[in-house]
Amino acid sequence: MSKPAVVIDNGSGRCKTGIAGEDCPKAVFPAVIGKPKQKGIMVGTGQKDEYVGDAAMARRGVLIIKYPLEHGIVTNWDDMEKIWSHAFYSELRVDPQEHPVLLTEAPLNPKANRERMTQIMFESFNIPAFYVAIQAVLSLYASGRTSGIVLDSGDGVTHTVPIYEGYSLPHAVLRIDLAGRDLTGWMAKLLMQRGYSFTTSAELEIVRDVKQQLCFVAEDYEKELANASSNSSLEKEYELPDGQVITVEAERFQCPEALFKPELLGIEMDGMHLTAFNSIMKTDIDIRKDLYSNIVMSGGTTMFAGIASRVQKEIETLAPPSMKIKVIAPPERQYSVWIGGSILSSLSTFQQMWVSKTEYDEMGPSVVHRKCF
């Protein structure tokens, strides 16, 4: 392998991509495909049938915005291929035939999803070698630990993966399909109760921005709620693209609260703190202490202010009183999956782990289950 690997952190919301060995992704773009709602009539203005990534976001007012990945699972393979092709040719400007590729995936994904990824990479892009890594494991690499439990929450999936001395504990891996995109939908609902309506795919992108700019996690939800009704110190204004100003108040912490109380969305699931706790309880009694003291947060949905101290507080309530609990939230955590991939694929000991083109030709797509864990 003469050329360095290309690392693609295949998120449901944003695709992070770059060259192995670098310390941050070279390009981060929305994992979206935009298709025009109406027919183009002005000749020569160079309209296209579809736009990818930032180009789609820039023209979102006239496009239908679609995400090919939902809850970490690819729902439209043709669109997914366009996103990868955009990553290789437009963002990184590399020829995929010359570089091994490391892709990331959420744990407990259907096996067929992984096989199809492998097939497209080898057959459409003709890459020399391939590997699929679990997102949370890479985040642990990036944090420089070999033991810990990773609480990763992105746009499509929230999952907890306990790892001890470098071994993953697959029986204790848990996943909830509640993450950033669900929070955006919930925020749109909360804003609707205030009298602001956001319905189209482009308007939901505005809601996502409101969520990212203004939301925070309350340390004590009930107290914050009582506080919000009595004074208006929480009020913040947000200017929409057309110049109107909307005001948000209690919505700022009601939105991310759904991570801890999925019943707000009418979903029967455990919140993220309980999922992490259950994950720890599924592991062997001897290693729980190490996991409690190394709870590593990663992913874009863990970027809310106040989330680390809230997770700490919630887990302290659940765990035995004498247990020391430490939540680690690195500042670069929205890219830590990519950073971990960059570290992993540039290790000399990793080079024998790649699935090579020859192996793929001999065994077909199922080879990926044998070599990638």
UniProtKB/Swiss-Prot annotation:
Alphabetically ordered keywords of this record: ATP-binding, Cytoplasm, Cytoskeleton, Hydrolase, Nucleotide-binding
Protein name per Swiss-Prot or TrEMBL: Actin
Catalytic activity: ATP + H2O = ADP + phosphate + H(+)
Signal sequence residues: none
UniProt-listed SUPFAM superfamilies: Actin-like ATPase domain
Residues that span the membrane, as ranges: none
Coiled coil: none
Function according to Swiss-Prot or TrEMBL: Actins are highly conserved proteins that are involved in various types of cell motility and are ubiquitously expressed in all eukaryotic cells.
One Gene Ontology term, aspect cellular component: cytoplasm
